[in-house]
A protein has these predicted regions:
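Residue-level marker of alpha-helix boundaries and capping positions
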Residues: 23, 50-51
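Short acidic, hydrophobic short linear motifs in intrinsically disordered regions
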Residues: 41-50
Length: 93
């Protein structure tokens, strides 16, 4: 199974980025929280590619420190380059 984001989810993630611009950690945290709240989950590659969050793990850690109950689910999928890789898929609990 290839790790590809469905078009409807890509569009939703791109809209979140467009509607919530900014490079700051707080802006990235806001986009991640909106993605988790509205879409139910997001993977690290989706956060990097579609939410412009270069260090999603750091942002997740900061959000957890603020009290958000974010759960990580590990999954192994094929990357766009065709290699197997372990990804984190995050959800709100």
């Amino acid at each position: 199974m290839s790790h590809t984001t469905p078009m409807h989810k890509r569009r939703a993630l791109m809209k979140l980025l467009h509607d919530n611009p900014g490079n700051s950690a707080k802006a990235q945290q806001a986009r991640i929280m909106l993605a988790l709240q509205t879409l139910g989950n997001a993977t690290t590659p989706e956060m990097v590619r579609w939410l412009d969050c270069p260090r999603p793990g750091a942002r997740i850690c900061e959000l957890r420190d603020e009290g958000h109950n974010i759960v990580r689910h590990w999954q192994i999928e094929e990357t766009e380059a065709g290699e197997l890789h372990r990804f984190a898929r995050y959800t709100l609990n």
